[in-house]
């Protein structure tokens, strides 16, 4: 077993609670375990995440749990979701011996906490059993405390929420075993030996078994201890083991749509899209004047029209280092508006604060430098030449996961042309924020 570091920067979760910290993009969950009635408290809880799969169905050499999503291993997102739930005391991840060092590197690089490692077995059930042994007091090398309840969850289901974790844990405390379920999407059929339809299941009467699942530790550990070699080799359903060997009928808990499992290549694209959507929900507009009539405020209004579902806040450049730190706790997109001239000193100050926040360690941060001038007063080519420093700066900060680009806005005296330029600027910024395309880093775009 390998304990992970005990602290890390916070980051956006999916309606999960935990200590607030720099980089927390979403509000804490309304769940309050500390103030709950005794019967509604989870008790001592640990989690086991089997991560020894080889990704055969995905058809890639890299096991899917280590495939990168936005330049970060998929399993890191799952660990993030679990460790932000403060009442989960220990998280045991089972990985193959050949991937043990890679897993240690992930824990160290992304500052994951409360993580211990155990070696995976040859099958899913054997891996889970090894994870349970890491928590069992009857094992001579056990360094962890046996929990009252243990959660079993897939390393490739990164969008698990605290609400469903709490509900399955409380159900497990009452019934001994519990698991999340979802409605069947497709009808399940049984083929005959010669490849013809034998019978089909009534979709309305059946459900898909999902993760997370939770058990009284003594129940599931006893089930695995009694488990036959056949079940350990070919079984896949933990709830069935609790029923078969400990006679505990699991309580089935309806789960949210986000419980889906990353299984195929296209699922990685879907996961990336969901993560991008989560971290693109807020934009901070940094401008160099408080004047309500300034182009910065006009651009802010244009962004509100373009992105009517996003939260858009603003601050003044003079406040960088003060108010801006409050925005950093919630925001992954910054639009810096400079009407008069490029002010690289203030820009570098903002970038330095972002780097010190450790925010870019976990997610790509978008920074767009908007420079406003009347295209009729200064030749566009001349203006672009004066901004070549943006490319060098963008290349420098890209190494730290900050995606910086420039935008030239036509600050025309003609009201119609100005409104057109503001609309185009808002559309360009929206695309940069939503897509987070590293290929556009250092580019000077024109609206």
Curated annotation (Swiss-Prot):
One of its GO terms (biological process) is protein O-linked mannosylation. The record marks 57, 64 as: Transition state stabilizer. It is found in: Cytoplasm, Cytosol. Its main location: cytoplasm. Keywords: Cytoplasm, Nucleotidyltransferase, Transferase. GO terms for cellular component: cytosol. Belongs to the IspD/TarI cytidylyltransferase family. IspD subfamily. It comes from the Eukaryota. Homodimer. One of its GO terms (molecular function) is cytidylyltransferase activity. This is D-ribitol-5-phosphate cytidylyltransferase. The gene is Crppa. Signal peptide: none annotated. SUPFAM superfamilies: Nucleotide-diphospho-sugar transferases. The record marks 203, 261 as: Positions substrate for the nucleophilic attack. Its EC number is 2.7.7.40. It catalyses: D-ribitol 5-phosphate + CTP + H(+) = CDP-L-ribitol + diphosphate; D-ribose 5-phosphate + CTP + H(+) = CDP-D-ribose + diphosphate; D-ribulose 5-phosphate + CTP + H(+) = CDP-D-ribulose + diphosphate. Pathway: Protein modification; protein glycosylation. Cytidylyltransferase required for protein O-linked mannosylation. Catalyzes the formation of CDP-ribitol nucleotide sugar from D-ribitol 5-phosphate. CDP-ribitol is a substrate of FKTN during the biosynthesis of the phosphorylated O-mannosyl trisaccharide (N-acetylgalactosamine-beta-3-N-acetylglucosamine-beta-4-(phosphate-6-)mannose), a carbohydrate structure present in alpha-dystroglycan (DAG1), which is required for binding laminin G-like domain-containing extracellular proteins with high affinity.
């Amino acid at each position: 077993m390998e304990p992970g570091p005990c602290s890390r920067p916070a980051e956006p979760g999916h309606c999960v609670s935990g200590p607030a910290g720099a980089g927390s993009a979403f509000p804490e969950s309304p769940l309050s375990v500390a103030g709950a009635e005794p019967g509604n408290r989870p008790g001592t809880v640990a989690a086991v995440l089997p991560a020894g799969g080889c990704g055969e169905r995905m058809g890639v050499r890299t096991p899917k749990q280590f495939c990168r999503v936005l330049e970060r291993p998929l399993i890191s997102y799952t660990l993030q979701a679990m460790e932000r739930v403060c009442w989960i005391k220990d998280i045991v991840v089972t990985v193959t011996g050949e991937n043990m060092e890679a897993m240690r590197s992930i824990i160290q690089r992304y500052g994951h906490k409360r993580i211990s490692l155990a070696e995976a077995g040859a099958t899913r059930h054997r891996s889970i059993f090894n994870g349970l042994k890491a928590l069992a007091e009857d094992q001579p090398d056990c360094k962890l405390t046996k929990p009252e309840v243990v959660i079993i969850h897939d390393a490739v289901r990164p969008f698990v929420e605290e609400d469903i974790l709490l509900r399955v844990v409380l159900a497990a405390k009452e019934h001994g075993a519990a698991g999340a379920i979802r409605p069947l999407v497709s009808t399940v059929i049984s083929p005959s030996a010669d490849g013809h339809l034998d019978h089909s299941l009534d979709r309305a009467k059946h459900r898909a078994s999902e993760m997370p699942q939770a058990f009284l530790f003594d129940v599931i550990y006893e089930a695995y201890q009694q488990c036959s070699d056949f079940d350990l080799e070919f079984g896949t359903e933990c709830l069935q083991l609790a029923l078969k060997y400990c006679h505990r009928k699991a309580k089935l808990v309806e789960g949210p749509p986000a419980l889906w499992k990353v299984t195929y290549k296209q699922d990685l694209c879907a996961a990336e899209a969901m993560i991008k959507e989560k971290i693109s929900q807020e934009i901070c507009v940094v401008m160099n004047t408080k004047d309500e009539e300034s182009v910065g405020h006009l651009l802010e209004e244009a962004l509100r029209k373009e992105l009517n579902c996003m939260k858009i806040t603003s601050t003044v450049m003079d406040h960088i280092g003060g108010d801006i730190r409050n925005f950093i706790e919630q925001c992954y997109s910054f639009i810096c508006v400079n009407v008069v001239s490029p002010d690289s000193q203030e820009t570098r100050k903002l970038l330095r604060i972002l780097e010190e926040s450790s925010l870019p360690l976990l997610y790509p941060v978008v920074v767009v430098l908007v420079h406003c001038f009347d295209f009729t007063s200064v030749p566009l080519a001349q203006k672009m030449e004066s901004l070549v420093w943006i490319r060098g700066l963008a290349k420098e900060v890209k190494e730290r996961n900050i995606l910086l680009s420039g935008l030239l806005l036509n600050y025309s005296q003609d009201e119609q042309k100005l409104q057109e330029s503001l609309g185009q600027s808002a559309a360009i910024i929206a695309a940069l924020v939503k897509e987070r395309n590293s290929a556009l880093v250092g580019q000077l775009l024109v609206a």
